[in-house]
Curated annotation (Swiss-Prot):
This is tRNA(Ile)-lysidine synthase. Its EC number is 6.3.4.19. It comes from Mycolicibacterium paratuberculosis (strain ATCC BAA-968 / K-10) (Mycobacterium paratuberculosis). It comes from the Bacteria. GO terms for molecular function: ATP binding; tRNA(Ile)-lysidine synthase activity. It holds the Pfam family ATP_bind_3. Ligates lysine onto the cytidine present at position 34 of the AUA codon-specific tRNA(Ile) that contains the anticodon CAU, in an ATP-dependent manner. Cytidine is converted to lysidine, thus changing the amino acid specificity of the tRNA from methionine to isoleucine. InterPro entries: Rossmann-like_a/b/a_fold, TilS/TtcA_N, tRNA_Ile_lys_synt, tRNA_Ile_lys_synt_N, tRNA_Ile_lys_synt_subst-bd. The lineage of its organism: Bacteria, Bacillati, Actinomycetota, Actinomycetes, Mycobacteriales.
Length: 320
């Protein structure tokens, strides 16, 4: 039997994802950049259900408006019932890549009409795992992207990037090549061009798949620990704070997740593993140290987590 073509392989992947996660959904959106991954996904999605393409113009390149309009025209030609271009402002805070990602996801969330299909591939997952590992960002980063994290859907997370490129070729589509993807100033671009090929050569291949398997295993373990922390949190509460004595009786991975959930519920944002461990030290290595500062969801202020009379407490202070 002949091996299925690239487009058929993608269609099978999207259909399987839809059956597993989106059975009752009548329509969906696709985040379309014009690149080969999202373009191939759009082609498949539009053949399966009524599809709205959402194109986010970050305005980071001189021809970004033209690229967005080309993507819109391609979406309509591929059978999308609608296609809209959303222009966003990228503030650059936290680095250009991170700022663009925040702006993109905010725009998609605000303008979506149903679940949002994203064109992330197995290669993207491997890159994400390596970035998280290199930055010491904790288990959540190394666990990579979830296939289904409503409203975000990643039906191609098990497919290699080469398959989406081949699917575009089968359809005769000319995909946009984002210059940022080959710009060595960006860490992900260097991982893609230099680090992963070297690892594949040194380790004899299969590295991308191995990294993705590792992400899946870590994600499953992490979800179990999150569930244990959710059960433990009510017993540790002391009003708006947390009882140190109750926290001290928990296993370290569960305790840190209880602390994380408490911080997030209190309005913390952008939490790092270092910050969570700093708050954890207020429980396990208490010597009268000061509070731990964390980001706040409200502009113009910071949150502080400290210990007082055997209780962890949160308070806000204006940014000066």
């Amino acid at each position: 039997m002949d091996r299925p073509g690239a487009l058929d392989r993608l269609r099978t992947a999207v259909e399987a994802f839809s059956t597993a996660h989106l059975g009752a959904v009548e329509r969906w959106c696709v985040a379309l950049s014009g690149g080969p991954d999202s373009l191939a996904l759009t082609a498949v999605a539009a053949r399966l259900r009524p599809t709205t393409a959402v194109i986010v113009d970050h305005g980071l390149q001189p021809d970004s408006a033209a690229v967005a309009q080309t993507a819109r025209a391609q979406a309509i030609a591929l059978g999308c019932v609608a296609a809209q271009v959303i222009s966003v402002h990228v503030d650059g805070e936290g680095g250009l890549e991170a700022a663009a990602r925040r702006a993109r996801y905010a725009a998609l969330a605000a303008h979506r009409d149903g679940p949002v299909l994203l064109g992330h591939t197995l290669d993207d997952q491997a890159e994400t795992v390596l970035l998280g590992l290199g930055r010491g960002s904790g288990v959540r980063s190394i666990a990579g992207m979830r296939p289904h994290d409503p409203p975000w859907c990643r039906p191609l997370l098990g497919q290699r990037r080469a398959v989406t490129h081949a699917a575009c070729a089968e359809l005769g589509l000319t995909a946009w090549q984002d210059p940022h993807n080959s710009d060595r100033r960006f860490a992900r671009a260097r991982l893609r061009a230099e680090v992963l090929p070297l690892l594949e050569e040194v380790l004899g291949g299969g590295v991308v798949e191995a990294l993705a398997r590792t992400a899946t295993a870590l994600r499953e373990d992490n979800e179990l620990l999150d569930a244990l922390a959710e059960r433990a949190l009510p017993a540790a509460r002391a009003g708006a704070g947390l009882q140190v004595a109750a926290l001290a009786g928990l296993d370290a991975p569960v305790r840190r997740r209880v602390i994380r959930a408490w911080l997030l519920a209190g309005g913390a944002t952008g939490l790092t593993d270092k910050q969570i461990r700093g708050v954890d030290n207020l429980v396990t290595a208490w010597r009268g140290q000061g509070a731990v500062a964390v980001g706040s969801s409200l502009p113009g202020e910071r949150l502080f987590a400290g210990r007082r009379d055997g209780v962890l407490t949160l308070w806000r202070e204006p940014v000066r």
